[in-house]
Amino acid sequence: MTTGLPSQTQVIELLGGEFARAGYEIEDVVIDHRARPPRITVVADGDTTLDLDTIAVLSRSASSLLDSLDNIGDSYVLEVSSPGIDRPLTSEKHFRRARGRKVELTLADGSQLTGRIGALQSGSLDLVVRAGREWKVREIPLAEVEKAVVQVEFSPPNPAELELATTGRAAGTEVEA
């Protein structure tokens, strides 16, 4: 049985330009033909936070574009969402977008680090870590990062730690290579 739904590639091609004009890119499209009604899930991300108002605007645009297809067929449910906080950071753009966020890294040698994401440059990541009572920047090659997951924080970060992550410098700290 065919549902008349477009393919993943067709959805990306149809919606990609509209999402790009809004400052977002489509990270994934999942089409579930078994759901009743069938479900099209579009996961988008960008350099600015994907808030509920933006999701509503993107959803309306996506729905209009999808509804304009001749072969869309039966009804469907459209979901537009962000990747979510538990999505592993897998590309340089993910790390860039998460600057200032607390992250847990697993490195190629099996060691784990928890710190705050700082600047990215030339295939490496500045990670702000606690060193005793101070904060220091450790440069971590992205090639050595096996897994990186943003951590949920329920309290505001230490101001010195956050300043170091966002500006790359703070009083009383040093850069460690």
From Swiss-Prot:
One of its GO terms (cellular component) is cytosol. Transmembrane segments: none annotated. InterPro entries: Ribosome_maturation_RimP, RimP_C, RimP_C_sf, RimP_N, RimP_N_sf. One of its GO terms (biological process) is translation. It is found in: Cytoplasm. Keywords: Cytoplasm, Ribosome biogenesis. Belongs to the RimP family. PANTHER family: RIBOSOME MATURATION FACTOR RIMP. Required for maturation of 30S ribosomal subunits. This is Ribosome maturation factor RimP. It comes from Mycobacterium marinum (strain ATCC BAA-535 / M). The gene is rimP.
